[in-house]
Amino acid sequence: MTKSIIAAIMTMNLTATVAFAQTDVHCHMIPESYMESLKAHGMEMDEGFPIPAWSAGEHLKFMDEAGIQTSVLTMPAPQPYFGDGNESAGICRRFNEEAAALKSLHPGRFLFCAALPLPDVDKAIQEARYALEVLGADGVKLASNSCGQYLGDPELDPMMEYLNSRKAVIITHPHKPSAVNGQLVSAVPLASYEYLAETTRAILNMVAHDVLVRYPDLKVVVPHCGSFLPNALPRFKGLLPVMTAQGYMKAVDVEKNISRLYFDLAGTATDDVLESLLTITEPSHILYGSDYPYVAAPALAGARKSLESRLALHGLDPNDIFTDNAARLFGAGIPVREYGDRIVRLAEIDVDPDKLDEYLCFAKEVGMVSMKTEPGVIGLFSMQDKETPSKVYILEVYADRQAYEAHIKTVHFRKYKVGTADMVKSLRLIDTIPLLSSSLNKTAVR
């Protein structure tokens, strides 16, 4: 094997499996206190579909099974404003304090972006200050609109000014728009298409008001694979010169606004969607999001595996998407993975051709069990030489020496070693040095 082939294998395989270190930036905390508030006003179905059951225990169980280290919690839709600003402020305060308590109870597992009682801007600023400066919130969550007040509305500028002073992360999420007529937004569930339109509407309104240029230290996370923005932004940019020349709009810096946006992959991140998203952003601004608990855990498991297998095809490093981009965005809230202590081994094995099939079964089993049950085993991949199928290569990647030593003492490794002893004709270890993910990606993915 040449060095370039080894690098390619490590990029497409090693980065496709990150053991228990992933970050989910799109998931929801739905405490009983929030549900009680909705029920008191008959608003449980305001978004057109039932709000799922949630508990911290079930959320942690999902995270453990999915290999998610950290989840960033936000309040779901609807926005808890029922005509009384004080009541809304109280609901948001209780939510934020419960989220802060959960973060404290499970260090490193939960972060949270605070709920704000919009459309009351003064109360929203007060709650943002309390959440960020006292509770230790990791950002804020803003609805696409609150009672028709959309992101980008000049009335929100004082709040944006404060958030900018805190260099805040803003997670946005679509909410039910005001209906044009009695049937337009209720004919089909909002999540089917109107949520995508709603997000696009809100973000374009921010761009049209140059919000992220005027407040350049804000970082805004756009949900659901960018919604319709990859299609809407080219049209917006194309029409902008005409609109400004006619006096309908002020000149804005579209590219600078877009550069402040981050995009989560909650929803359906198909090949076409990924390709489209990459026309408006760069890989370092793409993040993993599950939309748990609105999407059931079993469905998420299948979707996530499918996503992992496709990312490299688009020049995307799964380590960046699932972990490192979020760590850079949220800073100290998420630990950045270290590469220096990794152990990387490449074994070249000559197998008895008559026993090859049996050997491959052993190798496949030990690889699957090891990566599923041992957090320190980052990768264990078996490959056959195309010209000489009985020549097998095994790429082994361990978090550190301790993880390697623990691995070779496991029952499943001993089963593999003893079971294949008479199948292996020779074994040669190729010494390697682990590369940083970024340089490895540049070397191999072209």
State what each model feature region is.
Residues 2-4, 23-25, 30-70, 97-105, ...:
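Mid-to-C-terminal alpha-helical segments outside catalytic/metal-binding sites
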Residues 7-17:
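Bacterial N-terminal signal peptides
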Residues 26-30, 173, 224, 407:
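Histidine-centered divalent metal-coordination motifs
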Residues 29, 118, 174-178, 293-295, ...:
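Short glycine-enriched loops at secondary-structure junctions
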Residues 44-85, 109-117, 138-142:
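Divalent metal-dependent hydrolysis catalytic cores, especially in the metallo-beta-lactamase
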Residues 49-54, 80-81, 90, 117-124, ...:
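Acidic-and-aromatic substrate-binding clefts and catalytic sites of carbohydrate-active enzymes
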Residues 133-287:
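Catalytic pocket-lining loop regions of alpha/beta-barrel enzymes
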Residues 335-392, 397-414, 425-446:
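Short S/T/G/P-rich N-terminal loop/turn motif that feeds into the first structured element of a domain
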